[in-house]
Amino acid sequence: MGVRLGKTADKSVIVVEGRFDFQQHEAFRACLDEALERGGGLGLEVDLSWVDYLESSALGMLLVMRDRAKALGIDSIALLGCRGFVRQILVVASFDKFFTLR
């Protein structure tokens, strides 16, 4: 359970497992910092496939990530594995307007 960073040649993938809440803030920020250090030309994705709970602080973390990524020229961020409760929260919060939901 927790947050980890996966990398491929053309993108960074932040994988979140379990509860995505304020307890994950530091780990998420560390992964995001590392992903953004790789450069603005690479893609960025967040894999939420294994998230079973999502709270408002997680939404805030995603918005901060979007702002920081945009400042580096990353315009497209995909949220992967959005299903059930997680997808419902993201759609109700209009995150489908800010991110690609898959």
Placement of each model-derived feature along the sequence:
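General small-molecule cofactor/ligand-binding pocket signal
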Residues: R4-G6, L80, T100-R102
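Short beta-strand/loop segment at the start of cytosolic alpha/beta domains
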Residues: M1-V15
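Amphipathic alpha-helical interaction surfaces in cytosolic regulatory modules
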Residues: R19-F99
